[in-house]
């Protein structure tokens, strides 16, 4: 949706859902967030999506909210002041997207966690008895510009289509969106979380799916010439 049609008083939380139990937990945390006076929040679960990009595009089309948060069903947002924190960062119109963890410069592989300088913080709760504070570098100021962020949480203030024409599954959609933001002239940033983290992520421990490599090759074909890795 064009910027002039977006409603600055609304924030939408968009999630692809295949587990009602997980989404109920995710939604519980979202409904506990502090919503600034004059703003409203809407929650858009997308079920039976053929891919993450297709689901997120469907959610994007359903909302005219200026601020949209695309998050996994197993992401729990614990920062009560999230909405105001996002508004503060998005006061700079050139910022297109905010993630909670990512890398300053993508390596040739296109895999963000292989980058030399990773920024941000996420609490990973993969098992009931195992909680890991994944704490990378912290921005020196309120945020750090990065090239890519992880898809567990991506907030936007400009509507850019997710590349469902290329990423027809569940991998590399997030890094692709970051590159699409940059192609449109917008920055992608990670906030300072030194005092406290924004999200808990509860993924199941599992190896990378076999189709990951195929999407990695597709990513490199589309964006490889735009990568300038740090050495």
Where are these regions (language model features)?
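C-terminal catalytic/acceptor-binding lobe
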Residues: 165-231
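A recurrent flexible, glycine/aromatic-enriched loop bordering the glycosyltransferase active site
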Residues: 130-156
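Glycine-rich, basic loop-to-helix element that forms the pyrophosphate-binding segment
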Residues: 49-63
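A conserved hydrophobic helix/loop-capping motif in glycosyltransferases and polysaccharide synthases
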Residues: 10-22
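Short, well-formed alpha-helical segments that are part of the catalytic scaffolds
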Residues: 2-5, 19-35
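The conserved acidic donor/metal-binding loop of glycosyltransferases
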Residues: 72-76
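Conserved donor NDP-sugar-binding/catalytic core segment of glycosyltransferases
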Residues: 80-119
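Short aromatic/hydrophobic "clamp" motif used to bind/position activated sugar donors
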Residues: 68
């Amino acid at each position: 949706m064009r910027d002039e049609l977006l409603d600055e008083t609304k924030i939408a939380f968009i999630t692809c859902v295949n587990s009602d139990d997980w989404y109920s937990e995710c939604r519980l945390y979202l409904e506990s967030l502090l919503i600034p006076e004059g703003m409203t929040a809407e929650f858009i679960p997308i079920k039976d999506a053929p891919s993450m990009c297709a689901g997120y595009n469907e959610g994007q089309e359903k909302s005219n909210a200026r601020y949209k948060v695309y998050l996994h069903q197993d992401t729990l947002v614990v920062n009560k002041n999230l909405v105001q924190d996002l508004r503060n960062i998005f006061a700079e119109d050139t910022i297109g997207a905010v993630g909670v963890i990512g890398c300053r410069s993508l390596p040739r592989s296109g895999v963000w966690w292989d980058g030399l300088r990773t920024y941000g913080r996420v609490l990973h709760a993969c098992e009931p008895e195992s909680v890991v504070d994944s704490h990378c570098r912290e921005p020196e100021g309120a945020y750090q510009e990065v090239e890519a962020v992880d898809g567990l949480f991506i907030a936007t203030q400009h509507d850019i289509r997710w590349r469902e024409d290329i990423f027809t599954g569940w991998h590399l959609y997030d890094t692709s969106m970051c590159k699409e933001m940059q192609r449109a002239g917008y920055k992608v940033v990670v906030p300072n979380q030194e005092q406290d983290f924004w999200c808990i992520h509860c993924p199941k421990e599992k190896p990378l799916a076999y189709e990951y490599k195929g999407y990695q090759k597709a990513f490199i074909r589309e964006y490889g010439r735009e990568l300038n890795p740090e050495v």
